Amino acid sequence: MAGKLMHALQYNSYGGGAAGLEHVQVPVPTPKSNEVCLKLEATSLNPVDWKIQKGMIRPFLPRKFPCIPATDVAGEVVEVGSGVKNFKAGDKVVAVLSHLGGGGLAEFAVATEKLTVKRPQEVGAAEAAALPVAGLTALQALTNPAGLKLDGTGKKANILVTAASGGVGHYAVQLAKLANAHVTATCGARNIEFVKSLGADEVLDYKTPEGAALKSPSGKKYDAVVHCANGIPFSVFEPNLSENGKVIDITPGPNAMWTYAVKKITMSKKQLVPLLLIPKAENLEFMVNLVKEGKVKTVIDSKHPLSKAEDAWAKSIDGHATGKIIVEP
C-alpha cells in the first residue's frame, strides 16, 4: 500500500489534552517482516493513552513526535510482512500495538504478529478492541498476584474491585465471579445497578462513609483488591484485608511504589502489589473466547467516529465512562 494516505489523529508535543490532537493525512504504514497491516474497524481508549500525552509516564514511555496514540485495535489484515506465518489478508483480528509507537487513532495500523490474535465472527470489532489493555489487566491481576483460578476450582476468595464500572473494573468483576469469588465493588451511585448486573455480590457507593471506608457490608475481609481508582491510601485498605491480603494497584504512582517497598522491607503479610501489564497473545485469545462463549461481556460506554475522536479523548480524560470508549474509522 506504498504511497497511499490515511486519516489519523496525532499530537506534536506533551500536554494539550483533546485540543492537542490534530487531524492529519499521513502515509499508510508498511509492515515490517514480523508485522501485519490492519484496516482498522475499532479502537478503544485507555487512561494510559492520555497520561502518556500528558507526560505523566515520560521516564518509562518517552514519546517521539508526532505521535498517533492508542494501542487497542480490531480490524482486517490487508498486508503481511515477509516473516508472518499465521495471518493472511482478509483475516479478522484484534491486536495490541506498542505503547512506544501507538498508532490506533487512524484508518490503518501495523501490529506485531506475536500480539495479534484472530477474532471469531461471534465477537464484534468494538467488543474485541475493548479487550487488550483493560481485559488483560483484569486477567493478570486476578490470576497472578491474586491467584484465582477462573475455572472456579480454587479456594473461594473475597475480592474487592474499586471503580468497578470502568474499563478494567467491569472486566475484573466478571472474571472474579468466574473464579467463584465473593465480589464487593465500589462505584458511583448511578452505576450501582449496572455493577450488580455484572455479578457483584455487594456494591458500595464510593461517596458514602461506608463506601469511602471500603468496608464489606457482610463484614468480609478481602483476600485481594483490584484497585482501579485513584487517591486511596493503603491505610484505608489495610484494616479491611485478610491476614495475607493484597492490594493490586493497576495505576501505581510514587506513593504506591513507596508503600510497596516499605511492606517488602518490613515483611508485612498484607501487601501492596504494583501491577505492570505484560500483554500476551494467549491471554488475549483467552479473553476473546470468553466473550465468544458469553462468559464475559464488553460494555461500551460510547462510540465516536474517527472524525470526532477528540470527543472520545476528552471523555476518557473526564474519567466517568461506564465500560469502554470506542473510536471507529
Curated annotation (Swiss-Prot):
Domain comment, as recorded: A nonterminal hydrophilic domain (59-100) is essential for targeting to the chloroplast. The C-terminal part (101-329) is necessary and sufficient to select for the import site.
Record note on quaternary structure: Homodimer or homotetramer. Transition to monomer upon NADPH binding. Interacts with calmodulin. Interacts with HP30-1, HP30-2 and HP20.
Keywords: Chloroplast, Membrane, NAD, Oxidoreductase, Plastid, Plastid inner membrane
InterPro entries linked: ADH-like_N, Chloroplast_QOR, GroES-like_sf, NAD(P)-bd_dom_sf, PKS_ER
E.C. numbers: 1.3.1.-
Biological function: NADPH-dependent alpha,beta-unsaturated oxoene reductase reducing the double bond of medium-chain (C9) to long-chain (C18) reactive electrophile species deriving from poly-unsaturated fatty acid peroxides. The best substrates are 13-lipoxygenase-derived gamma-ketols, but is unable to reduce the double bond of short-chain alkenals and alkenones such as acrolein, crotonaldehyde, 3-buten-2-one, 4-hexen-3-one and trans-2-hexenal, or quinones such as duroquinone, decylubiquinone, coenzyme Q0, menadione, menaquinone and phylloquinone.
Keyword NAD part of the UniProt annotation: yes
Residues involved in substrate binding: R58
Domain of life: Eukaryota
Protein name: Chloroplast envelope quinone oxidoreductase homolog
GO cellular component: chloroplast; chloroplast envelope; chloroplast inner membrane; chloroplast thylakoid membrane; cytosol; plant-type vacuole; plasma membrane
Induction: Not regulated by 2,6-dimethoxy-p-benzoquinone (DMBQ).
Note: The trimeric TOC159/75/34 complex is not involved in chloroplast import of CEQORH.
Organism field: Arabidopsis thaliana (Mouse-ear cress)
Keyword ATP-binding carried by entry: no
Top EC category: oxidoreductase
Pfam families to which the protein is assigned, alphabetical: ADH_N, ADH_zinc_N_2
Family assignment from sequence similarity: Belongs to the zinc-containing alcohol dehydrogenase family. Quinone oxidoreductase subfamily.
Gene that encodes the chain: CEQORH
Subcellular locations according to the entry: Plastid, Chloroplast inner membrane
Primary localization class, coarse: plastid
GO molecular function: oxidoreductase activity
